[in-house]
C-alpha cells in the first residue's frame, strides 16, 4: 500500500480538520494516509487566548511531530497550514528549512505532492500560500498534483493548484460540506495518481 503523509500546522483547528478529513478520504481509497504536525512551541499560548484554538488543542498536540525521515518514507506528501500575509506560517517554514539537505541528494525527487491552506477571507491570498508550498515541492523535484477543474461539482471556487478554505475572522468558520465535496474530488485525483 502506498504511503501518503499529510503534514499540518494548525492554529485555529481548521488545517487539522481538513487534514483529518483528507486522511480519512485517502484511507477510504486504499492509501496508507498518516497525519503529522510541525512543531509549534507557542500553540499553548493561542489555546489560552483563542477559543477556536482551544477546541482542537489536544487533538493537534496528540499528532506525531514530522521529521525528514517521514518524508523519505512517503510516496506522496501533502502540506496544509494557515495563510499569513499570503504565505506559509513561520512554523511550517521552519520545518521546510530543515529539508534543505534533501535538495542535494534529490531524495524527494518524483514523489507526489499536494497542498491546502486555510485563510481569513480571500482565495487570492490563499492561492499565494499554495504557490509557496508548490515552489518548495518543485525545488525538491516533486510532482505537484493540482486540484484542477471539476465540472462535476455544482459550485466550486477553488484555485486549480490546491484547496483554499476561507476561515473568516479568528478562524471561526469551520470547513463546510461544500469544501468536503471539493476535498472528495481532490482525494479521487490524488489516490488515482499514487496508486498507478
Regions found by a protein language model. Name each.
Residues 1-107, 153-157, 164-196:
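N-terminal beta1-alpha1-beta2 submodule of the flavodoxin-like/Rossmannoid cofactor-binding fold
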Residues 109-155:
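Short, glycine-/small-residue-rich phosphate/pyrophosphate-handling segment
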Amino acid at each position: 500500500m502506498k504511503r501518503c503523509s499529510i503534514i499540518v500546522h494548525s492554529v485555529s483547528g481548521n488545517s487539522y480538520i481538513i487534514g483529518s478529513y483528507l486522511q480519512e478520504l485517502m484511507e477510504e481509497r486504499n492509501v496508507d494516509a498518516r497525519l503529522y504536525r510541525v512543531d509549534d512551541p507557542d500553540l499553548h499560548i493561542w489555546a489560552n487566548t483563542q477559543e477556536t484554538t482551544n477546541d482542537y488543542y489536544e487533538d493537534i498536540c496528540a499528532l506525531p511531530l514530522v521529521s525528514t525521515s517521514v518524508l523519505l518514507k512517503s510516496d506522496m506528501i501533502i502540506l496544509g497550514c494557515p495563510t499569513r500575509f499570503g504565505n506559509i506560517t513561520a512554523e511550517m517554514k521552519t520545518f521546510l528549512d530543515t529539508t534543505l539537505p534533501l535538495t542535494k541528494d534529490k531524495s524527494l525527487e518524483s514523489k507526489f505532492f499536494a497542498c491546502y491552506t486555510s485563510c481569513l477571507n480571500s482565495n487570492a491570498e490563499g492561492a499565494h500560500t499554495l504557490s509557496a508550498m508548490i515552489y518548495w515541492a518543485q525545488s525538491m523535484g516533486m510532482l505537484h498534483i493540482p486540484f484542477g477543474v471539476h465540472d462535476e461539482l455544482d459550485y466550486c471556487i477553488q484555485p486549480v493548484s490546491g484547496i483554499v478554505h476561507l476561515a473568516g475572522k479568528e478562524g471561526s468558520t469551520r470547513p463546510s460540506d461544500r469544501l468536503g465535496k471539493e476535498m472528495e474530488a481532490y482525494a479521487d485525483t490524488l489516490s488515482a495518481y499514487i496508486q498507478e
